[in-house]
Every structure is written in C-alpha cells, then in structure tokens.
C-alpha cells in the first residue's frame, strides 16, 4: 500500500496515489434498487494519520443537491468506503457525493449506526474535480473524481 510520509492537501494526496498506488476497479453494487451502474475505480494509501482514497467515476451524469454534512448524500451521485478497524463487528461508513459532501457513521449494521459529529467529519480533507458547489445533473459532464483524506 502506498504510504505518504509528509503533510499534504487532498489534491496532493490524489497526485501521490496516482503515481504510487495501483488502481482497483469496483464491480459490485450492493443496492439492487439502483439500476444505474457507472464505471468506478479507486486508489488507496495512507499517511501516519490518514487514510487516503481517490475515486474515479465515469459514465455518470453527476448530481449533487445535498449540501449538509451527514445529509442523505445517497440521493446524489456518490461513493462509499467501509472500514472496520477491529474484529468486533463495528464498522465506519464514509459516503461522499460527487462534490465531496460527506455522510459518516459507525455501528454494527445499517439500522444500528450513529452519525459522526459534524465537527469531526469536517476534519476530512476532500477535493472533487467538480468543485464543491451543488449541481444538477449535467449532460456536459460524464466523469468525476474525488480525493478524500480521512483522519
């Protein structure tokens, strides 16, 4: 796994991952109710204190209407990262819409999750190729990428 050993911004982390980390295609969509399945891949690495992720999405007409932290970003074009640091069944769910608005929770299952404090969520560095402003579905854009650095 790629290791970044200095301080950085989210765009710098994305460049580092592009140079140092292999790309992994995602071909599993867990939500059958969503028929649209864009091409998605990602790169992952870490620093001493952050998980570094870069998602690449194509074949999508991105939409980002949700603007509040821990809002229902699943209604927008979004990506997810699940992380379980211990073998106790508790996991973290990090969801981001295409402009980087996060929804972050932890717990043992989908119906038993607690939202992370918005002040803590705001420490996640994010950088989207689409910027950070809300957007409606756009026919002129068919791909986007998102870099996140999770403390």
Where are these regions (language model features)?
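Structural preference for beta-rich elements and adjacent junctions enriched in aromatics
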Residues: 1-151
């Amino acid at each position: 796994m790629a290791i970044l050993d200095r301080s950085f911004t989210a765009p710098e982390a994305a460049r580092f991952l592009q140079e140092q980390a292999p790309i992994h295609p995602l071909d599993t969509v867990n939500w059958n109710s969503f028929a649209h399945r864009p091409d998605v891949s990602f790169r992952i690495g870490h620093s001493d204190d952050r998980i570094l992720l870069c998602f690449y999405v194509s074949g999508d007409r991105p939409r980002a209407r949700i603007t509040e932290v821990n809002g229902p970003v699943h209604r927008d074009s979004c990506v997810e990262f699940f992380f379980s640091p211990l073998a106790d069944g508790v996991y973290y769910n990090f969801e981001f819409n295409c402009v980087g608005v996060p929804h972050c929770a932890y717990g043992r299952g989908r119906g038993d999750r607690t939202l992370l404090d918005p002040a803590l969520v705001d420490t996640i560095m994010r950088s989207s190729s689409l910027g950070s402003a809300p957007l409606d579905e756009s026919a002129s854009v068919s791909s986007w990428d998102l870099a996140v650095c999770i403390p």
